[in-house]
Amino acid sequence: MKKLKINYLFIGILTLLLAAALWPSIPWFGKTENHIAAIQARGVLRVSTIDSPLTYSVINGKKYGLDYELAQQFANYLGVKLKVTVRQNISQLFDDLDSGNADLLAAGLVYDSARVKNYQPGPMYYSVSQQLVYRVGQYRPRSLATVNENQLTIAPGHVVVNDLQRLKETKFPDLSWKVDDKKGSTTLLEEVISGKLDYTIADSVAISLFQRVHPELAVALDVTDEQPVTWFSRLDDDNTLSAALLDFFNSINEDGSLARIEEKYLGHGDDFDYVDTRSFLRAVDNVLPELEPLFKKYAKEIDWRLLAAISYQESHWDPLATSPTGVRGLMMLTKNTAQSLGLTDRTDAEQSISGGARYLEDMMAKVPETVPEDERIWFALAAYNMGYAHMLDARSLTVKTKGNPDSWTDVKQRLPLLSQKPYYSKLTYGYARGHEAYAYVENIRKYQISLVGYLQEKEKQEAEAMKLAQDYPAVSPEELNKAPFPFLSFLSQSSGYLTHSPSLLFTPQKKEEK
């Protein structure tokens, strides 16, 4: 019996050694790879995305974007660095997953039944609808029934293609479209804006952000209902990455981080006003250049473009603006506030901007330290508009109604209640025009988004023009004449061949003499 046991032990050890040697060559070995362990061993989370105002963008060397900030937080959660790769279109994103060049796709992608057959979706964090857009002043289609491929162009890999195919089969048999393999949704939106393209389809949030900079972009109709947005990873037997994503999103949902980031990028509202936005951008071109140095000089700790947006909301950048209540100037300061700040002339542009900036800094300093850094400005602006005491009442009301007093998303929803007697009668400082403070802050945020995007667009155009000038520098006639093939000499020698008829330039000489 003892010998038999020894033989079994030997066979067992031999079997284990053989299995260990053959393990990497077993066909399903790759499927059991621990994705999280691989990411942490590499020390880098590889994320592919698309360059857009919502997902990922770089402004003055600083990175922004809803998906970028979430991806950075997830990388921190895993204890690794973040590597972002920007692709031109959705099709290229999924190519990165297929080739193993990306761990995650974080680009505002929509959950779709066709996609989840081949890729693993993550938690859903907001929703969008797909909309058909056109340029203001052009024909607006009221239905997809008459839209054809000569008018409608879609980016490759766009989820709406599946919806269009279903609509073609069930409702609109004449519906057709074209897929441009070389362009992404952002480029196609720009071509609709410029008039090069009749229609394209994009998600409602991206369109809303584009309209802040390009008010001539208009929505013709909704192509789909609301659809959830999610991240995607490879679909296999290893669920470690999916589990980590679920834990991560649960944690940022519980601590309020997700709500703050969504408020930052999605909280600007969707009540787009074409006339107001167009008027604002005209003022950016015609009025702002004179005031810009003053905004930059006195902005200090806040973004000068935010200070400029506040001033436009207050006075439309009119130094002589006066309200029925007596507030005056670019920053619409009261007489008492101006005196407390040592100002002598509220209609003087520099005094008004410097005073308004200092008053806003005072409001920010009063905001409780429990409020997150990136949301303090909104509390300060509400206090700037309706008074600090009423802002405290709004926080108190938020607590009483089971909200978070440190969350701007929660507090701003209670602002309109400050003018309703059942609520203000129970507050310390009573009645306030909370609905006006709500609109005030929301308008400033919209102007800031428009200003940042518009200035970024102008910088991009100027950079492209400069590069074009460098690649193709202007040449004077004198420089041309010094060239190996002197241009002026050629013209003088060829004058006998130049006629009013272009066709005669290439007529043989003998035929001309004949």
Swiss-Prot record:
EC number(s) recorded for this UniProt protein: 4.2.2.n1
Protein name according to UniProt: Membrane-bound lytic murein transglycosylase F
Task performed by this protein: Murein-degrading enzyme that degrades murein glycan strands and insoluble, high-molecular weight murein sacculi, with the concomitant formation of a 1,6-anhydromuramoyl product. Lytic transglycosylases (LTs) play an integral role in the metabolism of the peptidoglycan (PG) sacculus. Their lytic action creates space within the PG sacculus to allow for its expansion as well as for the insertion of various structures such as secretion systems and flagella.
Top EC category: lyase
Residue numbers annotated as active site: E314
Native organism taxonomy: Bacteria, Pseudomonadati, Pseudomonadota, Gammaproteobacteria, Enterobacterales
Membrane topology note: Peripheral membrane protein
MF (Gene Ontology): peptidoglycan lytic transglycosylase activity
Primary subcellular site in the record, as a coarse category: membrane
